[in-house]
Amino acid sequence: MSDMLPLAMYALNVEPYTHTPAVLLDTPVTVRITMAAIDPEPFDEDKKPSTLRIIRRNPVYLDAGEVDEEKLIEELEGDEAAEDGDEASDDDKEEEDEDEDVDEDDEDDDEDDDGEDEYEECVVVTLSPETRCQQAIDITIAPEEDVQFLVTGSYTISLTGNYVKHPFDEPLEDLYSDEDSEEYSDDELDQEIEEDDELDHDEASSEESDEDQEFYDAISEGDEDIDEQLAKLEETSDVEAHLEDLIAKDNKKKRKQEQLDEQPETKKSKKTKDEKNTKATENEKKNKAQVLEGGVIIEDRKIGEGPKAKKGSKVGMRYIGKLKNGKVFDKNTSGKPFYFKLHRGEVIKGWDIGVTGMAIGGERRIVIPAPYAYGKQTLPGIPANSELTFDVKLVSLK
């Protein structure tokens, strides 16, 4: 374990009877958990000790998208046997049909066995405020592992540790193929550098010539005015004295004109810039989507006013619940609002996370992944493993 380099702190709260993923599936880093501690505030009045369980997907289990080579070979052989059977007698066909039925039953039994072995569940630790409040552990979870935690009991268990760099993690430079890089000889590189230098020099020369021409034109205009007045003077001393006066007056006039030109533009541009920044900030706060714990996504449509909802707050909500295909499965848009207390286990986990931080009058869209909604449960109008979208409005807060 000494070879693993800590990168950042890891922390996760596992509330009772809520399947909580150990890490997000798109987090390409190893996690090392070293401490489990209990929250002394109970979720219910039973005050039962909390047991932390780890649920791990079996790595050898075949995903739905993977191909079982043995089954594929059996299917191909079955097709060949069917073709040969066209030439066989009727009695042979009946025997083959019976064999195929038996094979199908065996395959169904194998699939049932595989489903039972898909997940492994183990007990990690049991904690209680009266006997043991915390326990040092040492669990390392690789990025490719599908791991969830589940607490049974009356108390939340907090897990802490570190995101670590594992010696077997793939370095970033290995993600890029050597075939993508072009090989150049020293002569080709020198030639390209010389060509780039020539292009840069030509562009710079062109820019300098344009700037010099503008500068010279401005000087020439000023010199013409001075020359006209100097032509009227005959003595050298008068010319020198008058020249200094003309130059000073001309410079003063230019500075004054520049100040007059810059002042209105500065005030106007500053005012316009402030208005744009204010509008941009408001729009950003209003429409920017945020990804919270467990992949719950919130997007504020309207910012409310007053105190914000927090843990233990009693909130009254209006809402419309939709499936991913847009079908409405539940709503509360009139009559008595829907009341509940935040983070007391009265609603699905995604609602506790998504409603926290809202103020009265606020409107928000909450997108909840299946594990933080109803998971594998099938409810009226809600299929198993459904992602749910709620458009909610906070109408009361206590």
UniProtKB/Swiss-Prot annotation:
Keywords: Chaperone, Isomerase, Nucleus, Rotamase. Residues 264-287 have a biased composition (Basic and acidic residues). Residues 66-120, 164-232, 245-288 are annotated as: Disordered. It catalyses: [protein]-peptidylproline (omega=180) = [protein]-peptidylproline (omega=0). Residues 170-228 have a biased composition (Acidic residues). The keyword Nucleus applies. Its EC number is 5.2.1.8. The keyword Nucleus applies. It is found in: Nucleus. Signal peptide: none annotated. Residues 312-398 form the PPIase FKBP-type domain. One of its GO terms (cellular component) is nucleolus. One of its GO terms (molecular function) is peptidyl-prolyl cis-trans isomerase activity. It holds the Pfam family NPL. It comes from the Eukaryota. Inhibited by both FK506 and rapamycin. Binds to histones H3 and H4. PPIase that acts as a histone chaperone. Histone proline isomerase that increases the rate of cis-trans isomerization at prolines on the histone H3 N-terminal tail. Proline isomerization influences H3 methylation thereby regulating gene expression. Belongs to the FKBP-type PPIase family. FKBP3/4 subfamily. This is FK506-binding protein 4. It comes from Candida glabrata (strain ATCC 2001 / BCRC 20586 / JCM 3761 / NBRC 0622 / NRRL Y-65 / CBS 138).
